[in-house]
Amino acid sequence: MVTSTKSVARKASAIVRRKFFFPVAAAVALAALAAPSASAARTTGTGSESAAACAGGTLLTAVSAQRLPAGATAYKYDLPNGTSFENIAPPSGFNYVTASSALLSELNMPRRPAGAAAMKTWEAQVAPFARSGISGSEKFCEMAHAAPEPEAATAGQGAVSAAPQAAGGHSGSTGFAGYELQSGPYHRATGHFTQPRTDSLNRSMSTWIGLNSYAGSAGRLIQAGAGNEIGGGGGSPFWEQYCSGGSASGCNAAVGDESAFARPGDTVSINVVYNGLTAYFQVAINGTLVINARDPMRSGSKTGGVADFMTERTAGDMIPTSTNITFSALRTYAAYNSNTSVPFGSQKYFGIEMTTDGHFYNPPCSNSHILMFPANVTSTGFVNNYCRSF
């Protein structure tokens, strides 16, 4: 549920996302850790394609590798805040159809259901994450600043009567466009989006899927997606645990996988989950799993009150010129161990429109204040419609 606590936290927060999607130089692999297959490298891009530096951030390399009981391999990375996360790779020859329940759990995949119809839905969800591009040679970059969170009507953004594209209401924002599902609580949000084609000027943005909560200072926004970098049409996949309640304790800035790259037109698949005090982040590009991170949450942390599907303008930058961004196969799960999901279109959704001044204006793009707005809702997705840069 959206409350005034949410807006207060947002107004009080001075934290902004800087230009955190920077290409990072390909680095030396850990000697004892396996490299991804050639096919995976071709699918996701190579380090040279995003080669430069982890500018303004901290370059992270794997410090250890551990074989888990069911056969997956966990590569450990230490974060500057003193915590660590693991990026988990499937075993060689992994087949999600025949894998044990224990292995599916290690890999952050939902339980295999019974019944033909349920199996068809389940296979469509897990198939994009079944081919591994993960290895100990992957380099991550934690940027120096965390992200803001999307604003809702309670933040005083000039919401009026319900817009045609938002069954649960709407607001304007200077930084976000997309929908927020408000039929939670949720433990899992999944879906795909098409990586947009953007210009090469000094502008950047990102598209992501996440879970959020507004329960005071314990609130957490857990999100994963892909950026559109300055100077390039695509960008690096990333994950982040952001303290949406206002306290920065135990949270991190965006952590980008600089060994992978999402090109314009690529299908980016996201699976964001939490269970107890553990957050899970999966990102796949064209069916190759590149991020399968497991990150601890501080005691008392709360998330899953809403599910967010957003395009975000990098603070301080003009929004790049862009193609429209199609979100598809969007589903949520009410329980971590459940194999029952609910499609996007059957839930209450709240629309957020990106504008020049943060106020809401009725679409379409003929209104010069509108930068990007969500519409074209189907049972399983929608489109973020680009209008103009600003």
State what each model feature region is.
Residues 2-41:
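Secretory targeting and sorting signals
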